[in-house]
Amino acid sequence: MVFCTYCGQSFTRDEHLERHILTHTNVKPFKCFTCHMSFARRDLLQRHYTVHGRDQNQNEIPAVNGMIPKSAGRTPIACSNCAKTKTKCDKKFPCSRCAGRNLRCTLRPTRRASKNANRVGATLESATDVPTEVTTVNVEATSKDTRAQENSSSPSSQKSGTPISIGPIMEETPDIAPPQPFTEQVNGGPTPPEFSPDLQESFMDHNLMSGFPGLTNPSKDSSDDGSSPRFLLDWSQMQMPLGYDNMIQSDLMLDPELSFDPNSVPLAPHADGILSIMPELANGGMESLITPFETPKMSRSFVELGLGNSNPAFHSHRHQSMPSVQSIPNSGNEMPAMIAAQDGWSAFRCTPTLPSSSCPKTAKLNLEQLEETLRNHEGWVSWSPRWEDNDLAGGGDHLTVMQLHESTRDKLLAIMQSFLHKALETHREGRGTSNGSHSPNPSGASNFVLLPPGRVLEYFLRSYSNSFERYFPLTSRSTLDANELMHCYNDRAASILVLLMIAQGAANIPSPEARMLTGGLTEACRISLFDLIERNIIMSGDPIVLHSALLFTVQAAWSGDKWQMDIAMGQRGMYFAMLRHSGVLDRSSHAASAQPQRTLEQLWTDWIQNESRSRLIYSWVMVDQDLALFHDTAPLFSVTEFGAPMPDADRLWHAKSAEQWSSTFERVHEFSSGFSSVGSGARPLSLRDLFRHFLDDDLIPMGIEMTPLQLRLLLHPLQSMVCQFSQLLSCFAPATYRTSISVHPNQAQPSSRNISQSSTRTRLAEVQALLQRWFDLAERYLKANPLCALMQTNLILFHLISLNAVTNFPEIERLARRENVDGTYHQLLWLHKRCIPDVEEAVFHCGQIFRLVRSMPRGVRPPWWAGAIYRVALILWTDSLTHKDALTSTSPQGNGMFPSPIAGPSFAIDALPPDHALIVRYLTKREGVPCVTKLDGSQMGLERAYPVLRHCVEVIDEGCSTRFSDAIRGKLERLSRG
């Protein structure tokens, strides 16, 4: 017995192992000389030649070539007589030995008798006993539900109907007459057969095989151990050349032992149009169509159309997406479960909450919908996005995305199938079959899944590069090459990474098909990533694994799926611990130049390796900051942990050659006295050292030039300090409300508690001064450099952190949920003061967040941008509650309990820069009436709650629609309705 070194599967014969190893190595040594398709086995190549009608020597293959169709996707085995005598059988029918001895040649079933008990045996008679007949089939118009019922029950006799002759249906016989030639057209192609409309409709819409028992009693797969995905185990899963797989109805491919006769198989709707471009089909020469597991080849003229270019052929279908309701069954079951679980979110809770036990589970639903959409091959071929290039790229692609090789897509497909199989097994525990194998799909569709076409995958990778890579720049040389990832690293780890890239890119596409792909891939990769780490703990420190974990955490945290969001928050601590234990957070101790004779290419390669490590480390810091900010918790990382150098300038990271990197390095790290900095090992400061210089206000005197990424990382410790002091202040109740409800107010005396509250406010004011120092550094950078997406994100985060210093957002959400609110006047005063201690400062930061978010292209915004609008909406809504009461319960003279509005000019708080005179006057003298700008350019006041929330909903509608943004929009709409 021999074993596979890749997967450990055992084999009894060496040739079986040799053939199995080809499935791991992806080596296909046999190539067709006509269409240049590659094959892993010689017999598959010989079978493929029958499609062309010529062999490798360009000799015509006779119609009677002795080959019989495969059964259940297997090569035919010896007949019963040869098997009993253990003699070699040529596998013809009848075989030469039986014909020579005048024996009855009987084909054996390809499955064991124990597993074939419920299957209808297919015993073929000898050639002399099977005449060629021309049959007439009665076709009756039935609905889809009736056909589905017939497929799941025993066959019944059809009612009498008008017989429609559809041409000769040839039974299997060793003597098959050659097809009649068609009249040649001018272009050299055969003329397709003509069908009348009525005949064609009946021919396409009815199941001609309903009388076969094998179709109504599909058996289970023969896999015992479940080591291979079920998608690769039955006849219907063998891939066909492009165009063939959509022509055969899926309900005819349920029985693996049903022999394939193309002349008796009804074609799927719209398949007749394909006949004119497939001479083999038009001529009936389809004796053996099954091809090895190979990506369908696509003409370059179609690929070069691209997605998102200015080609008129593309723009004619720009706003057409594949019909998800018709082509993807049960697509409407996705959103109700997602929406029902939104009230159970652990963050963004402005509506009454639900316990997690009451929320519907969505993991299994995501996987099943992924399986359904991957079966919809025709839908993905015709899929196109609904928006323009400017929305996707934001003025230009961030990275160059290399075209996917065919071998890369094949490898990715095979591994993805195993991921999906494992994930489905995980979530179907207790519902599977007794022997661990899968039964056919209940809907009657084929179990054969395919990744979307290469052009669609490249489009998703392009979307990923323009959205994710702008904020987490982890790809060097300005080039994203999935082929290199798949062939230069661990297969499973690299596949998880590439699939998560595709899922991340698809998440930004406003398409139901893309959402289904994203949700299922994220869940499948999560399970496989966790399994990969469990099986080999050494992989926990692998950069590819940590990169994949980063992608999963970001994608799941902002997915809009309650369960994926919770898992991301729960598992981030595990991934943070993996990062700590790998030792990469500490500064490297090896010598900077151990080999003085290194070439420029070697220096560049070493620098890229070190820079990749730094960027991966500090990308986790940014993820920690984002999750902590929007969940109102303290970051898990401490600034003192980071001794590794920070990422260097993006100009160096995006250099495409060693010479370009060398010249840029000389300018970025310029040494005095004319010495070359290349090869010196010069690296930026660590975050710990940079923050120390920032506290000492030494960055400008020391001439330290900051990059947008370094400015972003500098906000992490500032956010930690704001969170710490804000949480401490929330433990103190405002004196006004305490005094108003105190029984003995005169007994209130200074105490250690008051001293602690005062000192905490002083410390918080110091942090606000540090935030202003950071803002000065950012403005200094913007005076010398153009505004980029990362810098816009930095400014949004700055205003969000500043909002946390002047508001109590958890209390605002409690007020929105009406928790412990009795509606009294004194409580409203107390709640407003407790939620927003500094109204003018809070309104200013809210307006700036509006301005920055709306100035960003909708397709390249950070994944949490809708969460920023959510926080702004609730703060302005809370402040408008007091304005509303002031308008209804005070006198025109303003002598009521609420102060009268401050006099001054009205101004758009979301359209003016921070240094504008009106904003400065509003912040310093508290003069002016802030407004927001509507879509039509008019200004709207902030005095009424409902218009404020509606305006925030409109701002969300301006951006890209995702599951997360749609959920935030729904929450704000529910709040506006009260």
Swiss-Prot record:
It comes from Zymoseptoria tritici (strain CBS 115943 / IPO323). Residues 432-445 have a biased composition (Polar residues). PROSITE patterns: ZINC_FINGER_C2H2_1, ZINC_FINGER_C2H2_2, ZN2_CY6_FUNGAL_1, ZN2_CY6_FUNGAL_2. Transcription factor; part of the gene cluster 29 that mediates the biosynthesis of dihydroxynaphthalene (DHN)-melanin, a bluish-green pigment forming a dark layer in the conidial wall that protects the conidia from UV radiations. InterPro entries: Zn2-C6_fun-type_DNA-bd_sf, Zn2Cys6_DnaBD, Znf_C2H2_sf, Znf_C2H2_type. The keyword Cytoplasm does not apply. One of its GO terms (molecular function) is DNA-binding transcription factor activity, RNA polymerase II-specific. Residues 79-105 bind DNA. CDD domains: fungal_TF_MHR (cd12148), GAL4 (cd00067). The keyword Transcription regulation applies. It is found in: Nucleus. A zinc finger (C2H2-type) spans 2-24, 30-52. Residues 113-231, 426-445 are annotated as: Disordered. PANTHER family: TRANSCRIPTION FACTOR WITH C2H2 AND ZN(2)-CYS(6) DNA BINDING DOMAIN (EUROFUNG) (PTHR47660:SF2), TRANSCRIPTION FACTOR WITH C2H2 AND ZN(2)-CYS(6) DNA BINDING DOMAIN (EUROFUNG)-RELATED-RELATED (PTHR47660). It holds the Pfam family Zn_clus. Residues 152-165 have a biased composition (Low complexity). Keywords: DNA-binding, Metal-binding, Nucleus, Repeat, Transcription, Transcription regulation, Zinc, Zinc-finger. Its main location: nucleus. GO terms for cellular component: nucleus. This is Transcription factor MYCGRDRAFT_87993. It comes from the Eukaryota. Gene3D superfamilies: Classic Zinc Finger, Zn(2)-C6 fungal-type DNA-binding domain.
